[in-house]
Amino acid sequence: MLESAPFARLPTPMNVEQARFNMVEQQIRTWEVLDQDVLDLLYVVRREEFVPAEYRAFAFSDLEIPLYDGADEGERMMQPKVEARILQELAVKKNEHVLEVGTGSGYLAALLAARSHHVYSVEINPKLKAFGEENLRRGGVENATVQLGDAAQGWRTFAPYDVIVLTGSTPILPQTLISQLKVGGRLFAVVGDPPVMEARLITSVDEGSCYTTDLFETCLAPLKNALQPARFEF
């Protein structure tokens, strides 16, 4: 469990940059993130500015960070290495439109926005929607739209999308989400139940057809209202 105050103060500016360098070189690069464009972006988008004030001393740590003090929903920022792998595996292009399911702090949305034409981020928690939106505004991110709603099984408003990212896990992947991908589109999701979950990349080949690549094992808190498997009664 993280302690916040009195250990929340960031180091001096020089040490902040050293901590960022260590995060990239020791955590992220060693986790098979070798795309130099992704690594460079992690120096540009300042992670510490998206972390709640009481946890900023942990901004570059290899752990999940609570998104606001006293959170009763369990929302957390992903580990930096997971965020970086997501960026690398999705290989987002500048002309692409992205759906992010779960805004959280807004940090991943900012990273995605730097590589895409526009990010549509949907957050079910009003407090986190406001938190993430304000972080994006302060960060000068103009090509990300944050909306309040439930996108765990899709978001038709701006569909279809080139890229879809789920920032929480889902026991099974809804077909409605896959159907909102453009041909050639990619979807990142962590699928399964604890303690065994698999990060997967789903690529749309043509209408109604896709293939799945298993990327790595991890464990994320589930999305609210994530699709559950059918339960049979005897």
Q: What does each model-identified segment do?
A:
Residues 2-99, 107-110, 115, 128-142, ...:
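Class I SAM-dependent transferase core
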